Amino acid sequence: MYYHNQHQGKSILSSSRMPISSERHPFLRGNGTGDSGLILSTDAKPRLKWTPDLHERFVEAVNQLGGGDKATPKTIMKVMGIPGLTLYHLKSHLQKYRLSKNLNGQANSSLNKTSVMTMVEENPPEVDESHSESLSIGPQPSMNLPISDALQMQIEVQRRLHEQLEVQRHLQLRIEAQGKYLQSILEKAQETLGRQNLGAAGIEATKAQLSELVSKVSADYPDSSFLEPKELQNLHHQQMQKTYPPNSSLDSCLTSSEGTQKAPKMLDNRLGLRTYIGDSTSEQKEIMEEPFFHRMELTWAEEESLRENHNRPYLSTMVNNAEPRISSSRRSPGRLSIGVGLHEHRGRSSNNSEYTEERFNENNEDCKLETHTRTALDLNTHDENYGTTRPKQFDLNGFSWN
């Protein structure tokens, strides 16, 4: 029973739905008569297809009601008077119409465009134009960049990159050239250093040879020219003390002067004699060969100056009409100048000097020597036993010895 009733109910529902499905054809017109010209879909919420005629009637109704802002779906439905139109259909279409009105009267057909443009020109055209102008002007700076400028900028960037690459290449070439130049300089410096080392070795060899020559010369000629001044003075003092004692007389001096003719070099080395020859070249040779005697004369002159400063008695006896002593360069070749310095004890009197002068005058005539050279004899005797010394000088000029 219950099953029969349920099945019967289902049949009733199906029977009740059948006429609706038969009536709702995909596009049915109005109440089935087709007078209204409506085309509806078969969805749960049937959609209306707005044809140009239907839209034209909708626009007329909206215009009668005073425009899209004042018109409502209910008033539009009453004015149109088309059966089958619902508020849902009119409401959606009115919204679209208002949007199209706000977007400068866009319409679905060419007929609607004229009516929409007339409605838009009445109230909002200035606002829309200003807004459109602002919209058109706003994006122009960002969108209207010329393509030529962009290409020019790209070309400029590429050119700068190319220039930078060229500069880097030139720098690399210059760095390589500089490195090669420095390498060549280093090689040349090494070569010069090697040559300098060879030169230094040669210099050392020459120094060794010179030292050997000096040692040989000093061994062969142990003369005073290789000695120091102090050693020369000491040697001079020792030689003078050995040759002439402090109490030696003028006879010993004269005999020693005679011996100089026999052995001049020995006496020159021991007594400090210098033979002056008239020829200047020979005189220069003698001076260059015997520097020791020049130093002896200098030391003798210094001793004489010191004695004068200490105000000690100085006796000078001039012989042969008291002729003054002249320099050896002005004397004739046949004259002899002998300077004798006798150092005596402080306790001795001046009788010794007078006695020496008398003996010299007596022996003056016997001692005659014929010489063609000028001889300067400087004899200084130093006695270490005496506390003080009294220098005496005898200058003899104008004697020719036979």
UniProtKB/Swiss-Prot annotation:
Which segment of this protein is annotated as the motif LHEQLE?
Answer: 161-166
| Tissues in which the protein is found | Expressed in phloem and/or cambium.
What keywords does the record list, in alphabetical order? Coiled coil, DNA-binding, Nucleus, Transcription, Transcription regulation
* One Pfam family from the record: Myb_DNA-binding
Q: List the stretches of this chain annotated as a DNA-binding region.
A: 73-98
Q: Where, subcellularly, is it found?
A: Nucleus
Segments of this protein annotated with the region Disordered: 238-266, 344-363, 382-402
Q: Does the keyword RNA-binding apply?
A: no
Bias-annotated ranges (Polar residues): 238-260
Lineage: superkingdom: Eukaryota
Query: Which PROSITE patterns has this protein been placed in?
Result: HTH_MYB
Q: Which residues form the HTH myb-type domain?
A: 42-102
What this chain does, per the record?
Answer: Transcription factor that may act on the GAL1 promoter. Acts redundantly with MYR2 as a repressor of flowering and organ elongation under decreased light intensity. Represses gibberellic acid (GA)-dependent responses and affects levels of bioactive GA.
PANTHER family xref list: MYB FAMILY TRANSCRIPTION FACTOR PHL11 (PTHR31499), MYB-RELATED PROTEIN 1 (PTHR31499:SF46)
Partners and quaternary state?
Answer: Isoforms 1 and 2: homodimer. Isoform 3: loss of dimerization.
- The protein depicted here goes by the name Myb-related protein 1
Name of the gene: MYR1
